[in-house]
C-alpha cells in the first residue's frame, strides 16, 4: 500500500468507534495505536534477542538498559513478552495485557507514550467491547521500515494529524507544511553553503522552534546526508553523506511532540536527535536557552495570539538586549514575528561562522503595523542590521487547510559581499503545477524542477531577471526578480499641517439635507423614559423647526470659512515599500457643493478644535446648541 492507502485504512477505524468517541476524539485512538504499531513492527526482528539478553543479565547487572538497547539496535526497547499477535491471541485479557505491553517499553519511550494519555482510551474501548476489533485492524497493516520507509511514515503521521484538525476545524493558525514546501525551504536555507557543508568532518546543528512532527528537521538532514528521494528513487544526490547533523526542536502540542520524538528514535539509532526535541512553549519556556545553531527553519502558526505567553514574553522583552525580544513586540493577536526574533536570538555569532534561517509566514509580518509599532520596529531591526537576504512569494493553495499567500524569508548574519546592503525579491507565485488530487485546500505543488528554477534565480542575483510565464493559456515574459538596497524599505512618519477648509452656507439645498444629519436628528431624541423623555423629544422638535426657520432667513449668498489641521503618514519620496493607510479627510455638515473652494485661512495649529463658523446674528440666536451641532465636525 502507498501512503494514501495506509492513511485511508487507518482512518477507517473511525467507522468502528464513531458511536463511542466524539469526532474530536478520534485521534485519541488512531494516533497512539499508529505509533504503537510502528514500534511493534520496528522491534519485531530483534524481539527475541532482547528477551534473551534480559534473561541472561537479569540480576547480574544493576542497569540493563545499555545491553537491551544494544540488543534491539535502537535507543529504545520493549521487554514485554507481548506483541500485537500475542495480544490478540488472549482476547479475554486484552486490556490488561496491552497495558503490560506499554509498560515494557524503555523509560524514554514510555515518556513519549504517556503524552497520549492512552490508558484512559484503553479502558473506554474495553468497556465498549471495541478493543479487540480496533487492535486487530491495526495488526492488519504492516508498518515495518522495509515496507514503509521513514519519509513515508512521516507523511502518514502528518496526513493523520491534518485530518484530525480538519475534522474539528481547530487550530486554524497551525498549518502543517507540505513536503514540497519543506524541500524548497531546506534548499533555500542551505543555498550557497554547499562547499562549507562538503568539508571533511563537517558537523552542523539544525533547529526548529515549532517543529510539529519534525518534518522540516528530518528533510533538512536528508538533503545533506541522503539526498532528495521520491518513491525510493534519488532525484538529487546528497551534499555530504559523511556530515554529522544534530537536530534540535521544541513543540508545545503533546501529541505531535510524541510523534516527532518516536519517529526520531526510530531514524537515529543513538537517540541523540530524539533527546534534543523539547516539550513546551517556545515563547515562554525556551528549553534551548543559551544554545546557538548553524541552520534554523520554521513555519510558525499564522495569526495565532500569544496571550497565554504574554507575561513571560513581556518580562523577556524588558531584559532588553539580554533577552530575545529586544527589537519590539508585535500585536498580541499574531505571534509569528516573536518566533522570528527567537530564531535570531539563537543564531550563531558571525565570528563563529554565522547562521542561515528560512522561515515561512503569511503577509501579516510584511505589511501589518503603523510607523513606530512593534511590527515596524522589528522590520527596521532586520533591515538596519542587514539580515534579510531574500523574500520569495509562493503560490497560493499550497497548504492543506488554507489557500492564503505565503512568503519565505531567507535571513543570514553572514551575507556574501555582493549581497551586503541589498534585498532580493522573487516572485515565485507562478512556479507551480496542479495536483492530480486535491488534499484539503492544497490544490497546487512546487515540483523539483521549479524549485531548481527558484534556486537559480537566487544564485544569479540579477535585478530585472525575467521568465516566460504561462497564464490562462497565454505566455508572457514577466519580471520575477528585483533587487533593492535595504534603505529602500525605510520610511518616516511626519505630520503635515495645513488648513482644512470648512465652509458654511445656508442655501436651500443644504437646509434640506439637515433632516438626514445625525447631529440634527439627535435634537429630537432623548435617553430618558416615560413622560420626561417625551417632553424632551417634543422640545427638540420645536428647536428643529425654529432652527430651520432661522436658517431660511439667513442672508442668501453669504458664507463663512473655518480652518483646522490634519495629520497623515508620508513616506520619504521614492522610498515606499510597505503601504500604511492614510487617515481619511474629515467630513463636515453643511459642506460645500462639489467643486467650490472657499478661501484658505492661515490660522492653523496642531490639535486645533474644529471652529464654529461666525454668524452675524449668533448673539441673538436662541438655539446655540443647534448651530453648534450642524456646524461642527462629525
What are these regions (language model features)?
Residues 9, 16, 25-38, 254, ...:
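Conserved Class I SAM-dependent methyltransferase catalytic core
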Residues 20, 307-316, 321-335, 364-374, ...:
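Short, contiguous acidic/charged loop-to-helix segments that flank catalytic cores in large enzymes
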Residues 175-298, 303-315, 323, 337, ...:
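Conserved S-adenosyl-L-methionine
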Amino acid at each position: 500500500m502507498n501512503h494514501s492507502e495506509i492513511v485511508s485504512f487507518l482512518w477507517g477505524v473511525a467507522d468502528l468507534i464513531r458511536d463511542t468517541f466524539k469526532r474530536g476524539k478520534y485521534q485519541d485512538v488512531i494516533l497512539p495505536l499508529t505509533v504503537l504499531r510502528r514500534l511493534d513492527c520496528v522491534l519485531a526482528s530483534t524481539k527475541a534477542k532482547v528477551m534473551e539478553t534480559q534473561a541472561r543479565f537479569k540480576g547480574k547487572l544493576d542497569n540493563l538498559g545499555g545491553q537491551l538497547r544494544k540488543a534491539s539496535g535502537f535507543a529504545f526497547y520493549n521487554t514485554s513478552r507481548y506483541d500485537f499477535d500475542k495480544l490478540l491471541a488472549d482476547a479475554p485479557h486484552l486490556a490488561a495485557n496491552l497495558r503490560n505491553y506499554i509498560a515494557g517499553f524503555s523509560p524514554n519511550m514510555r515518556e513519549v507514550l504517556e503524552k497520549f494519555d492512552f490508558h484512559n482510551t484503553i479502558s473506554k474501548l474495553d468497556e465498549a467491547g471495541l478493543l479487540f476489533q480496533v487492535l486487530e485492524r491495526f495488526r492488519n497493516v504492516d508498518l515495518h521500515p522495509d515496507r514503509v520507509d521513514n519519509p513515508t511514515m512521516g507523511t502518514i503521521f502528518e496526513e493523520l494529524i491534518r485530518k484530525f484538525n480538519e475534522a474539528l476545524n481547530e487550530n486554524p493558525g497551525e498549518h502543517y507544511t507540505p513536503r514540497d514546501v519543506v524541500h524548497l525551504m531546506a534548499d533555500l536555507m542551505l543555498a550557497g553553503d554547499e562547499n562549507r557543508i562538503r568539508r571533511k568532518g563537517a558537523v552542523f546543528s539544525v533547529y526548529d522552534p515549532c517543529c510539529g512532527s519534525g518534518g522540516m528537521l528530518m528533510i533538512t538532514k536528508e538533503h545533506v546526508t541522503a539526498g532528495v528521494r521520491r518513491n525510493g528513487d534519488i532525484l538529487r544526490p546528497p551534499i555530504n553523506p559523511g556530515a554529522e547533523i544534530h537536530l534540535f526542536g521544541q513543540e508545545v502540542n503533546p501529541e505531535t511532540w510524541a510523534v516527532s520524538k518516536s519517529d526520531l528514535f526510530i531514524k537515529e539509532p543513538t537517540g541523540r536527535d530524539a533527546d534534543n526535541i523539547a516539550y513546551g512553549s517556545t515563547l515562554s519556556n525556551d528549553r534551548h536557552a543559551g544554545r546557538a545553531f548553524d541552520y534554523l527553519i520554521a513555519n510558525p502558526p499564522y495569526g495565532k495570539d500569544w496571550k497565554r505567553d504574554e507575561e513571560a514574553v513581556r518580562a523577556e522583552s524588558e531584559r532588553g538586549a539580554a533577552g530575545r525580544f529586544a527589537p519590539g513586540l508585535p500585536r498580541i493577536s499574531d505571534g509569528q514575528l516573536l518566533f522570528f526574533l527567537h530564531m535570531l536570538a539563537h543564531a550563531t555569532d558571525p565570528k563563529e561562522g554565522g547562521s542561515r534561517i528560512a522561515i515561512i509566514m503569511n503577509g501579516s509580518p510584511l505589511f501589518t503595523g503603523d510607523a513606530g509599532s512593534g511590527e515596524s520596529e522589528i522590520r527596521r531591526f532586520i533591515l538596519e542590521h542587514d539580515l534579510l537576504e531574500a523574500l520569495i512569494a509562493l503560490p497560493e493553495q499550497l497548504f492543506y487547510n488554507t489557500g492564503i499567500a505565503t512568503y519565505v524569508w531567507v535571513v543570514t548574519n553572514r551575507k556574501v559581499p555582493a549581497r551586503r546592503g541589498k534585498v532580493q525579491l522573487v516572485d515565485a507565485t507562478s512556479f507551480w503545477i496542479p495536483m492530480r488530487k486535491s488534499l484539503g485546500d492544497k490544490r497546487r505543488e512546487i515540483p523539483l524542477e521549479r524549485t531548481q528554477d527558484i534556486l537559480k534565480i537566487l544564485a544569479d542575483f540579477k535585478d530585472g531577471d525575467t521568465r516566460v510565464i504561462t497564464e490562462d493559456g497565454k505566455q508572457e515574459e514577466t519580471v520575477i526578480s528585483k533587487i533593492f538596497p535595504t534603505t529602500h524599505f525605510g520610511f518616516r512618519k511626519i505630520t503635515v499641517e495645513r488648513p482644512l477648509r470648512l465652509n458654511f452656507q445656508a442655501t436651500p439645498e443644504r437646509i434640506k439635507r439637515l433632516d438626514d444629519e445625525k447631529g440634527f436628528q439627535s435634537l429630537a431624541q432623548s435617553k430618558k423614559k416615560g413622560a420626561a423623555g417625551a417632553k424632551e423629544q417634543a422640545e427638540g422638535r420645536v428647536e428643529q423647526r425654529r432652527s430651520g426657520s432661522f436658517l431660511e432667513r439667513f442672508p442668501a449668498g453669504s458664507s463663512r470659512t473655518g480652518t483646522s489641521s490634519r495629520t497623515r503618514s508620508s513616506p520619504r519620496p521614492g522610498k515606499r515599500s510597505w503601504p500604511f493607510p492614510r487617515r481619511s479627510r474629515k467630513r463636515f455638515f453643511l459642506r460645500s457643493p462639489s467643486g467650490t473652494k472657499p478661501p484658505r485661512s492661515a490660522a492653523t495649529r496642531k490639535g486645533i478644535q474644529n471652529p464654529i463658523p461666525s454668524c452675524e446674528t449668533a448673539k441673538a440666536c436662541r438655539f446655540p446648541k443647534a448651530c453648534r451641532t450642524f456646524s461642527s465636525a462629525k
